[in-house]
Design a protein with these regions (language model features):
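A structural signal for multi-pass alpha-helical bundles of membrane permease subunits
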Residues: 6-282
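N-terminal Lys/Arg-rich, disordered targeting/topogenic segments
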Residues: 1-3
């Protein structure tokens, strides 16, 4: 029986490893193809589209950088602004729902969380009219930042409230006895204890904002204000119409992927800590 069990376990492990390998290959292959094609010229792209060819055309990256460098800085500004605004509002909202008791609290919380269930496409037109006509924020960074941050806040409140509820109540009670008001408890106790979850929320919002395409496309008109997703699509269409190949545009996609990869590489530990902490504590 033991031998039979060991064989079953070994077979299941082998099957699991094969499945993981296949999934990893499916994830890595498109990005690897993107890198390979970004070094080609027209003839190499046509006749050897998915294999390495020589010479490597690094000038594709020079062309792409000249076109996307301004929009990279725009995207950094927009993504960081959205992430910071969302984290601040979510932390304050989550803390209020976690620590304070007021009439209708659970109803308000349920309505806030219910906003996540509404497909964003349903309110796209009304949001556009509100931002561009009512608040006169068309073709401005504020028109991109404020609505996107507001849309991410309900999830942040839900995430942080669950984490705040799990923190030791004794620490806050002791601080209250020592004379610390709610603001001091929030700034000096709750937030420092919640850094992994706060960092996780920041990273999730940053990646969402960095990759967002539809809303910046609708709001921004001046090319100097384009975010990277909008600018890359414009660059891809323009370059292909003029030259009939995609390599410099693909080089642009590689360039704009690097900040996310570097950011995640340096913060993956905090990201995983926050996700696992949230899984156990929510």
């Amino acid at each position: 029986m033991n031998k039979v069990k060991r064989k079953k376990i070994m077979h299941s492990q082998v099957a699991l490893q094969i499945a993981v390998f296949i999934l990893c290959a499916l994830v890595v292959y498109p990005f690897l193809t993107l890198i390979i094609k970004s070094f080609k010229d027209y003839e190499q792209e046509v006749y050897s589209p998915i294999t390495f060819t020589f010479p490597l055309h690094f000038e594709n990256y020079e062309i792409a950088w000249l076109y996307v460098k301004n929009s990279i800085f725009n995207s950094f500004f927009v993504s960081i602004s959205i992430s910071v605004m969302c984290v601040l509002l979510s932390a304050m909202g989550g803390y209020a729902f976690s620590r304070f008791s007021f009439k209708g609290k659970e109803i308000v919380y349920s309505l806030t969380v219910a906003l996540m269930m509404m497909p964003s496409i349903l309110i796209l037109t009304s949001k556009y009219v509100l931002v561009s006509v009512t608040f006169k924020m068309y073709d401005s960074f504020l028109g991109v930042i404020v609505p996107q941050a507001a849309g991410l806040v309900p999830f942040g409140i839900m995430l942080l409230r669950g984490y705040f509820d799990s923190l030791p109540k004794g620490l806050l009670e002791a601080a209250e006895i020592d004379g610390a008001n709610s603001a001091v408890q929030f700034i000096k106790i709750t937030v420092p204890l919640s850094i992994p979850m706060v960092m996780t929320l920041f990273l999730m919002n940053f990646m969402t904002s960095w990759n967002d395409y539809l809303w910046p496309l609708m709001i921004l008109h001046d090319e100097a204000k384009f975010t990277i997703s909008v600018n890359l699509q414009s660059f891809t269409d323009y370059f292909y119409k003029m030259n009939q190949y995609y390599a410099p545009a693909l080089a642009g996609y590689v360039i704009v992927s690097l900040p996310i990869l570097v950011l995640f590489g340096f913060t993956s530990k905090q990201f995983i800590q926050g996700m696992t902490a949230g899984a156990f504590k929510m």
